[in-house]
Amino acid sequence: MASTKLFFSVITVMMLIAMASEMVNGSAFTVWSGPGCNNRAERYSKCGCSAIHQKGGYDFSYTGQTAALYNQAGCSGVAHTRFGSSARACNPFGWKSIFIQC
């Protein structure tokens, strides 16, 4: 009985560690004020919708979570662009919000 409880406790801890490490290594969207991929940078990696403040260039680092970019605030309307892999462009863009699917 004690060995069964220990076994399930160990399995539970291992699952929690795996889930926590997945959250730490989530996809991330970095934007710069510009020109290009220079000057002030902001990074977005939380699940759900985030407002984009810098628009000089971007880098999306894909690690399993896809993202949708919107031309409207609040991730409203139809997604203009979707990322399912890493992408980078050091040119100005007009997206106003990003939704990272977790």
Swiss-Prot record:
Pfam families given in the database record: MiAMP1 (PF09117)
S-S bridge residues: 37-90, 47-102, 49-75
Secretion signal span: 1-26
Gene3D superfamilies for the chain: 2.60.20.30
GO biological process: defense response to bacterium; defense response to fungus; killing of cells of another organism; negative regulation of growth
Any one GO cellular component localisation term in the record: extracellular region
Subcellular location: Secreted
Sorted UniProt keywords: Antibiotic, Antimicrobial, Disulfide bond, Fungicide, Plant defense, Secreted, Signal
Its biological purpose: Antimicrobial peptide which inhibits the growth of a variety of fungi, oomycetes, Gram-positive bacterial phytopatogenes and S.cerevisiae in vitro. No activity against E.coli.
Other facts noted in the record for this chain: Its antimicrobial activity is diminished by calcium and potassium chloride salts.
Protein name: Antimicrobial peptide 1
